[in-house]
Amino acid sequence: MNKQQTKFLIAFAAIAMANKEGFTVDAANLQPVTSGYAVAVADTQNSFGLEGLANVVKYVSEHPNINAFGGWYNREDNMYYFDATVIVNELEAAKELGRVNKQIAIFDLANLKEIRL
């Protein structure tokens, strides 16, 4: 992990600790994303813990088309998951990208609602 990735890892971990229920932040500036639809990337599915977080940071740094980081707490298994995330403005396009990435849901950031696929 290079110096820039390490800085993102530390910042990302702090964001996760401050937002225990979940969050989505812009990959470039780590500012909250409040509109559009968050679609997790299949390649970082089931990333949890420090190792999972490091994998997501590395993946995003190597894939410039990934424009956000996400994290969410799963009450069913009591684990905090991290995702490389694409923010899509159009609902139908987001749903299609979600299906391509084998997701069970996407997230409407403006209304803070899960959309099952």
Predicted feature residues:
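Conserved, structured core segments of small domains
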Residues: 1-117
